[in-house]
Amino acid sequence: MRNNEFVFPKDFLWGAATAAPQIEGAYNEDKGLTVWDVTADGNVRYGENCKVACDHYHRYKEDVALMKKIGLNSYRFSISWARIFNDKTQTVNENGLNFYKNLTDELVKNGIEPICTLYHWDMPVLVYEKGGFLSDEFVSLFGNFVKTVVCALSDKIRFWITFNEPQCFVHGGYEGGWLAPFQKNGKFIVQKIMRTVMLAHGEAVRTIRKYSVLPPKIGFAPTASLTMPVNDSAEELERAYTQTFKGYAGQWGDPMVKGVAAYGADFLSKEDLKNICEPLDFYAFNVYRSDNSSEVYKQGMPRSALGWEIVPKSIYYAAKFAYKRYGLPIFITENG
């Protein structure tokens, strides 16, 4: 091995990630409606929707076979809450739950580690109509959903992610209006929603630890624009690190991991922070782009179809900065 080579350990997890509304389809089969099902029409640029998608609900065995074929040893998927509780009685929908049992069994049978995301943007309409994140009931409703899933699947699943990209579904869905349910609200409403999501995260962590059959590994999966250093001088690294966590990364991560309200999260009380900050086993990070105030850095960078600069080394700095701040094992749970 050359000195500049890094050898990944044998138990390193190489995987892929999806979300229920992105791939499952079967939107009205063994499932209640979600906010994406009822608000996407007229709000998505090219008219895409979640009705059929990849038809993963009916073709999951083929999909798992493809995962095995390309050599994945882990797979992150999300549970559709509306598939577990699909009517107003709050009775468990066994057909929906059995889908996830069967999927998990198929993954394990093929030597693929299942990693479960409990919320990936798709609030059930039944919960939304109760007030959603603005309802005092949300935390207990989410806790009951988590308990149901954990009791059913934790004999096979070790890795749990409470929320995927709260920065996106809160600020994109309720402030900027570019994600479901496509609302534009003021600061007070957005802060109230942030508080609810963070409290629900804490409740989910406690619930997983209480009911899990296998010893659980728990985290959450934020995303944020990483500020790239222009060079590796100590001063520049510190500037980039500080700037990264002045935004959404610190606003969400500090309360949930450190129990500290910083960078625009000062609306949280000490009691809130106590309930939000439960010990985590890893810090997940979805890394899609870098950011830098210096346009000089961006000149000549290749760009994605979304216009985002492609900087492979951003994954290195994301992991480096996240570990420096939170001291937890790092999962890169999405990248692109």
Per-range role (PLM):
Residues E24-Y100:
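Active-site-adjacent substrate/metal-binding segments within catalytic domains
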Residues R2-V44, D87-T89, L97-N335:
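Active-site region of glycoside hydrolase catalytic domains
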